[in-house]
Swiss-Prot record:
InterPro entries: Ribosomal_Su5_D2-typ_SF, Ribosomal_uS5, Ribosomal_uS5_bac-type, Ribosomal_uS5_C, Ribosomal_uS5_N, Ribosomal_uS5_N_CS, Ribsml_uS5_D2-typ_fold_subgr. The keyword Transit peptide does not apply. GO terms for molecular function: rRNA binding; structural constituent of ribosome. It comes from the Bacteria. Pfam families: Ribosomal_S5, Ribosomal_S5_C. NCBIfam families: rpsE_bact (TIGR01021). Residues 11-74 form the S5 DRBM domain. The N-terminal domain interacts with the head of the 30S subunit; the C-terminal domain interacts with the body and contacts protein S4. The interaction surface between S4 and S5 is involved in control of translational fidelity. PROSITE patterns: RIBOSOMAL_S5, S5_DSRBD. SUPFAM superfamilies: dsRNA-binding domain-like (SSF54768), Ribosomal protein S5 domain 2-like (SSF54211). This is Small ribosomal subunit protein uS5. Part of the 30S ribosomal subunit. Contacts proteins S4 and S8. With S4 and S12 plays an important role in translational accuracy. Located at the back of the 30S subunit body where it stabilizes the conformation of the head with respect to the body.
Amino acid sequence: MDKKDLGEVEYLDRVIAINRTAKVVKGGRRFRFSAIVVVGDGNGSVGAGLGKAHEVPEAIRKGMEQAKKSMTKIEIEKGTIPYEVIGKFGAGRVLLKPASEGTGLIAGGAVRAVLEVAGIHNILTKCLGSHNPHNLVKATIEGLCRLESPGRIAASRGKSISEI
């Protein structure tokens, strides 16, 4: 896990996957690389990006730039999420369940990296459907973006938190 110091904000970044593609030309194969990168501040902000280039470091750099531009704020309560939610993107679905203190981060692969950079420490997850890293990253972020704090839900309904 790397920390990048940009001005006042320190970002955590993770490379999820690097893919190599080949274009066959008369003189041989021409390779290009793509990299899926997630970036977060460890305190409720997370973003994902896909960078493509002829070299791996350049693809990672482009992915990090795109991830920083797509950062969104998510609701975190005491190191976990307020309630259970399913994030969907394409054929990938991710079930996210809140967990009590001390449970840890029960997640694998792409989902784990997204949750780590977002700053979530106690959560249970299950990948349903596709296990494609592109879809899992986007489904996880989509599920986290759908979360709202109980206070905000109560205010939108015009009720107190205890009534909900």
